[in-house]
Amino acid sequence: MKITKITTYRLPPRWMFLKIETDEGVVGWGEPVIEGRARTVEAAVHELGDYLIGQDPSRINDLWQVMYRAGFYRGGPILMSAIAGIDQALWDIKGKVLNAPVWQLMGGLVRDKIKAYSWVGGDRPADVIGGIKTLREIGFDTFKLNGCEELGLIDNSRAVDAAVNTVAQIREAFGNQIEFGLDFHGRVSAPMAKVLIKELEPYRPLFIEEPVLAEQAEYYPKLAAQTHIPLAAGERMFSRFDFKRVLEAGGISILQPDLSHAGGITECYKIAGMAEAYDVTLAPHCPLGPIALAACLHIDFVSYNAVLQEQSMGIHYNKGAELLDFVKNKEDFSMVGGFFKPLTKPGLGVEIDEAKVIEFSKNAPDWRNPLWRHEDNSVAEW
């Protein structure tokens, strides 16, 4: 079997799908994208495609190493996202050829279900509470919320109080009927993270995500030493080599590699194993589309330390398309009691509505994240 063609489709709301075709008619799908940089990743995919055309898709490990090592410069969000989507599609092909789901090819199930959680947008308490109520109606009881709006490098007590007030109102509205993590989104400087984490402790969040940017990872063990709240990070780390340094330094309790950013299934399975050796749990980052989610689920079901799975159903970014709009077998992604079950169809287990993908790709938006500024007009972290 040989790879004959690679096609990319930029899609709303901010996704990109990839299709790999073979000379035997077997097709694999992947989802390579960096939100806001889809065209750049697309170019990287087709650069890698120059080598991949004519290669045997079953040699996933060798193809991965070539894509990563054959270029003198390596790593980073663009290349690793391109590799990720290609890797997902190669696993999809392998599973279809062998008539088995990917998790079966990786040793079989380690669990029968995985807890799902949903991102809830909004910075005003009433908006967040309303969003939680809506999502509870479709079965969610675990959520992730903004931990704050933009904060200055050293900000005032009013800004801290505003962030804490939102969380306090949510806990008061729902008590312990729900669990929620708080996403600082890298918006918070190390000095302010120290203050804000302390103030939020009484509301017992499930975790605090990206308390500081990955570039400031040396602060993770320092922040962890001052709180009992688990710290989570990983969406802006792109290979096992990035995660190695964080695991060795300590401080992170929940690793969040993104299956569409961190080298795909092949690399993230290695990252999961590394985390397990350090007694660190896994909760793959996934505010993206259905192929990315499927890839995450296969890792969840073969990784002992996987504890939570993010997904984008109902997320406020989803303008123009919802999570399962391009999927034919929607029922396979249904949840029971807030849990996903294993996908059982061969490969990734996603049946893509290709005609709809082609149609929607004709007018795909170029999504960009907002540009925020502080009161003094300096750029703020979003």
Swiss-Prot record:
Pathway given in the UniProt record: Carbohydrate acid metabolism; D-galactonate degradation; D-glyceraldehyde 3-phosphate and pyruvate from D-galactonate: step 1/3
UniProt xrefs under InterPro entries: DgoD-like, Enolase-like_C_sf, Enolase-like_N, Enolase_C-like, Galactonate_deHydtase, Mandel_Rmase/mucon_lact_enz_CS, Mandelate_racemase_C, Mandelate_racemase_N_dom
Pfam families: MR_MLE_C (PF13378), MR_MLE_N (PF02746)
Gene3D superfamilies xref list: Enolase-like C-terminal domain, Enolase-like, N-terminal domain
UniProt cofactor note: Binds 1 Mg(2+) ion per subunit.
NAD listed as a keyword: no
Keywords: Lyase, Magnesium, Metal-binding
Stored NCBIfam families: PRK14017.1 (NF010624)
Descriptive protein name: D-galactonate dehydratase
Domain of life: Bacteria
Site (Increases basicity of active site His) residue list: D258
Cofactor: Mg(2+)
Stated family: Belongs to the mandelate racemase/muconate lactonizing enzyme family. GalD subfamily.
Function, as annotated: Catalyzes the dehydration of D-galactonate to 2-keto-3-deoxy-D-galactonate.
The species this protein was found in: Escherichia coli O9:H4 (strain HS)
Active site per the UniProt annotation: H185 (proton donor), H285 (proton acceptor)
Reaction equations catalysed: D-galactonate = 2-dehydro-3-deoxy-D-galactonate + H2O
